[in-house]
Every structure is written in C-alpha cells, then in structure tokens.
Swiss-Prot record:
Bias (Low complexity) ranges: 186-198
Gene name of the record: ERF1
InterPro entries (alphabetical): AP2/ERF_dom, AP2/ERF_dom_sf, DNA-bd_dom_sf, ERF_plant
GO biological process: defense response; ethylene-activated signaling pathway; fruit ripening
GO cellular component, one term: nucleus
Keyword vocabulary terms for this entry: Activator, DNA-binding, Ethylene signaling pathway, Fruit ripening, Nucleus, Plant defense, Transcription, Transcription regulation
Family designation: Belongs to the ethylene-response factor family. Class 1 subfamily.
GO MF terms, alphabetically ordered: DNA binding; DNA-binding transcription factor activity
Tissue: Present in stems.
Identification of the protein by name: Ethylene-responsive transcription factor 1
Annotated region of DNA binding: 106-164
Chain segments carrying region Disordered: 186-214
Domain notes: The AP2/ERF domain binds specifically to the 5'-GCCGCC-3' motif. The affinity of this binding is higher if the seventh amino-acid of this domain is basic.
Coarse class of the protein's main subcellular location: nucleus
Amino acid sequence: MYQLPTSTELTFFPAEFPVYCRSSSFSSLMPCLTESWGDLPLKVNDSEDMVIYGFLQDAFSIGWTPSNLTSEEVKLEPREEIEPAMSTSVSPPTVAPAALQPKGRHYRGVRQRPWGKFAAEIRDPAKNGARVWLGTYESAEEAALAYGKAAFRMRGTKALLNFPHRIGLNEPEPVRVTVKRRLSESASSSVSSASESGSPKRRRKGVAAKQAELEVESRGPNVMKVGCQMFQLASSYWLVKIWS
C-alpha cells in the first residue's frame, strides 16, 4: 500500500508583480499618449488607475499607438435644403350670392292679396276667437293701423299693436278699398289693356269676368272662390256660367 510521505517539500517561487511608479506625470514613459491625450489623470495610490495604466503600457509595448484610434477629420459641407415646390392649385371661383329681394315689413293682422292690396283682419275674443274682417287697404301701413285701432278697442292696453305710439292721436280712419272703387280701377285697367289689343268683344268679356271675380272676393275670406265662364247669346247679351 502506497503511503504518502509525512512531509512534503513545497517550493515557493516569488511572484513578480509589476510595480509602476511615476513622477508628476506619465509623459516620460509614454510620450505618444501625452501628445495625443495630454497628461492622464492617473493616481499612483489608486489601484484601479494602476490597472488601467498597466493595460496601456502592455498595449504600448506590443506596438499599439493612439494614432490607430484617431478618426480622420471629416469636412462638413453645408447641406442644401430643398424647398418644397409651391402648389399651383387653382381655387374654385367664388360665386357671389344673388342679391336678395328686400322684403317688406310684416305687420300683425295684415295679409297681402294676390293682386297687391293688403287685407286687415282680427280675431275677436268675445266671439271665441272668430276672425273679423276689417277691410282691404292700399298699403300695408294702412291695414296695420286699422288692425291696431280694432285691437285697442277690443283689448285696451293689453293689445299688441303695430304702431303703439300712434294710438290716441285722433288720426282719421284708413281709407278702405271698396268694391266700387276696385271695380272701377279694374274696369279701367281692363279697358286700357283691351283697347291696346283692339278687340271690343274681348274687352267686354274681360271686364265682365273681372267684375264677377271681384264681387266674389269682396264677400269675405270665408267665401269659396268660384269660377265663371261667359257665352255670347246675341250681339248684346251674355250668359255667365258660375261654378264652385
């Protein structure tokens, strides 16, 4: 059986550790580093600085120089900025809005007739709000004034008036457009228009039809409008056919 020797002779070889000493700077040891980087801020009493210094010295001993890491200076040239192309889109032509026709003022209790006159009417609270016909007038102001006088008589100071500042001025009543006046005006207009055409039969027929239409319209707003048709029976007699 093999036995280990009781005593073993161990031989220790002293390890050689590089010890670096420096003066005020390391420029005497590595002048190339000093030329490139200047004096390195390494401290002798700092173990980490000494390790870095050892790596640098070993690399320097095998031929490494700081010039291998120096990058060539690149000349910076000004970059030409490309301006965005101007858009040449053509905006659509703007169409000017059509001039609005000026509308007349709307008065309370006033309606305009198809032939241009203005009718005034009011609802009577004493008759469960029934519509009361006040008349037809030449202008909207006259019809509005007639409505105001009637409303003031019915409701007093609670009435909503078109011209409240004109109440109590003792103004004359607005002139109504009566049936006779309308008939005379329409007849004269019909005669003038027919005289231009030069046909006496058409003139008499137009006057009679216009008179019949005005008679129906003058009976009030609740009367149904009717039509009429005229037939000539003799040289001076006419037959009028009226239907609803």
